[in-house]
Amino acid sequence: MTDEIVRDLARRAGIAVEWQDYAGQSHVVSPPVLRRVLAALGLPADTSRELSASRRLLTKRSSLTDLPPLVTAVAGRPTRLDVGGSEAQPAELVLESGETRHVALLPARGRLRVPAIAEIGYHRLRVEDREIVLAVSPARCRSIEDVVPDARLWGLSAQLYGLNHPGDVGIGDLAGAADLARAAGAKGADAIALSPMHALYAADPARFGPYAPSSRLFLNPLHASPELVFGRTIKVEPSSANGLIDWPEASSAKYSLLRRVFEAFLDGDDWDGPLGADFARYRADQGSLLYEHACFEALQAARMPQREWRGWPADLRDPHGAAVAFFAASQPEEILYHQFLQWVSDRSLSAAQRVAREAGMRIGLIGDLAVGMDPNGSHAWSRQSDILLGLTIGAPPDLLNPGGQDWSLTGFSPRAMEQGGFIPFLATLQAAMRHAGGIRVDHAMGLARLWLIPEGASPAEGAYLNFPVADLLRLLALESVRHNVVVIGEDLGTVPEGFHDMLEQSGIHGMRVLWFERDAQTGFVPPRGWGSTDVAMTSTHDLPTVAGWWKGSDIDVRHEHGRLGEGVDPETVRKEREQDRPRLWNAFVREHVGEGPVPEPDETDRVVDAAVRFIAKTEVPLSLIPLEDLLGQEEQPNLPGTVTEHPNWRRRLPMPADSVLETEAVARRIGYVATERPRQ
């Protein structure tokens, strides 16, 4: 009986007590897993008393005093409040502009309804003695078609850390991104999609995976470019790094450089000039979030090698406690240094986006928003009530990953978001959009649901937790329009039924990748069948490059690292690839982007040329070509499921970013794309 009460509580909390796997088989989530997920939501369920208390917390109340702090609405449409009422209720609406209106909340099907409001923004609704934020969004995000009607744009995707720039110290930076944007814009490109730039760990350079951030509110100073901020060349020792990045060595060199720049800033004329004033404004604008991030960075450096904050003494685990305040007061210059790093990073990104737009790009830089954050990071420490401590994000078992996946990330608590007016979600969106022309939302399904795993459990022992997707999509649309940012949702793999349609209706562009565009009749879907609303690409950072796929080297690498799937014979996979090669080549020939007999596995140049032209011929509003494919490289940036055994996130471009586009093969491929998709 108690287990059934737990299941009922879980359902009411938005936890799916059953789920279907990739084969359609149903699974029931065990009560211990449900209890762990409930506990992370602030709904303990281990005893009868806890169950009763948690059930009371979920009991819906319908009085005005129980309204949440923020309610979303769509411009031009009335909005039902979760408040009962049979008579009209007078209210005062204060628009974001300051205009005040007197409105009536009218009853509709037993609930009060806010009349339609045309103006988008964060307005205030006052009813009796209760005031809430009414976030009125446009119906859709800003789309590529809003930027350029009937668009057929093209752009590049690049791993920021891998860009090569004469002034870097072995890790790609935003000066390299600016160089690439300037060169690509001159050739007709309208966008550059970059790998995540989120803050990692200044004191722990061994943790360099860009999708496992310490905080998504701040940036990784390793990508900062002081020359973009100070307008002068900063003397650095030339980097000898080629091929693979040595993150600890390069990080040490970069932070040594940034420390020198900081000290010169404090002692020089800039401190009392416009740049000093700009730094002061930035610190004021970012407020407590920046201060706490700087405290965390300084504390972690002092606590190393005890790097995980949950292992720190109890008084240091409280970001608002006396011990942390005492530490910060005793290290004022160190706190200021970490705030300076964020200011330089922020202004570097702003400058790089400005260069992209001045180069003629209609979109410019597209940032990447990771699905979650490291539970041992800055955000988790400073805003513990925001997140699902004790749970990690992953994926249930599937054909390629029969044991499931644990990404060692955590995310926002949907209950905490709703109770707190979605402040952390909005802050994350605003940080991602501040200096971007577009954002890519990694694992966009996380807007609707996440697979959550209790820490210490296997990935298969998880559960789906539903999120307030309608609210999140409205807030995403509002911030997108306010920032003039287009939104791309990574919607690959298995997603809930209707999710693709939901994204499309919200103006979010999905992703179409060559390897997944299959057709039972012809093998591969022709370009005209790729639709007209998504973003097309040859591959992604987690998938084989065109040359690697054609040669079959991706099969060898996955087999070497045990990533083919349990019990999968590599010879079977190789034979399937032998059958797929002519299917892909024939698709190219039918579209007149390839000709002649099927190339041999090691004849990759013609195949890469054809793939790039094939993607360019699609009718989607934006085609993105990874630099790895423009260069004809075999190696992919990341092999999912591996950490140190494969050189993930370490590959460098063989030459400066802007010079890459001038090489014969790259120039030829860009010519194909620019001819098919000329800038209008």
Residue ranges of each PLM-predicted region?
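Acidic/aromatic-lined carbohydrate-recognition and catalytic surfaces
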Residues: A39-G76, E92-R111, P115-V127, V133-S382
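Carbohydrate-interacting/catalytic domains
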Residues: M1-L194, F230-E237, L473, V481-V486, ...
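Alpha-amylase-like alpha-glycosidases and glucanotransferases acting on alpha-linked glucans and related
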Residues: A203-D346, G372-L622, E628-D629, T644-E645, ...
